[in-house]
């Protein structure tokens, strides 16, 4: 193993230790606002949520959320940016999020990614999508071909433009 890889691994492990791991929203009576108040009382740390998270029409921002273990549904919400979110283990629904301007730090989506009917103009830091990718009715669908999109990120499924 190269020294650079060892250093990256050590730094990644240190970051993991600073990550508050929340098993699921059910521990907060499935109430996003209760979770946010708890996080505020803890100094708004970086955090991850295990399992699925349904926040449709519910949020404008995700705060310091870094990872979601399962499916994340933000479809039709007022979300503007995914902020610090880096990894979604399952699929990610952002369909019809009219205020969405940025994918923030998002790098990995384990399942499909629906960006249909959004104003997203760039895939930002996105490196991988495990399922299909819907870019229909977006500025990206007019700007790039399927082949160009495939050259930008790695993924398994179909691209819908």
Where are these regions (language model features)?
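N-terminal capping/linker segments that flank leucine-rich repeat
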Residues: 1-61, 144-161
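Concave beta-strand-loop units of leucine-rich repeat
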Residues: 49-61, 66-79, 84-100, 105-121, ...
């Amino acid at each position: 193993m190269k020294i650079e890889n060892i250093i990256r691994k050590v730094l990644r492990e240190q970051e993991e230790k600073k990550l508050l791991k929340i098993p699921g929203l059910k521990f907060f009576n499935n109430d996003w606002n209760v979770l946010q108040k708890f996080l505020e009382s803890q100094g708004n740390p970086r955090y991850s949520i295990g399992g699925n998270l349904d926040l449709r029409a519910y949020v404008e921002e995700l705060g310091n959320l870094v990872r979601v273990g399962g499916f994340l549904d933000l479809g039709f919400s007022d979300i503007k940016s995914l902020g610090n979110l880096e990894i979604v283990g399952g699929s990610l629904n952002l369909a019809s999020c009219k205020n969405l301007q940025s994918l923030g730090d998002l790098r990995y989506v384990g399942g499909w990614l629906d960006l249909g009917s959004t104003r997203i103009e760039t895939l930002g830091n996105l490196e991988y999508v495990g399922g299909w990718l819907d870019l229909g009715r977006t500025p990206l669908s007019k700007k790039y071909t399927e082949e160009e999109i495939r050259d930008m990120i790695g993924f398994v499924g179909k691209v819908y433009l």
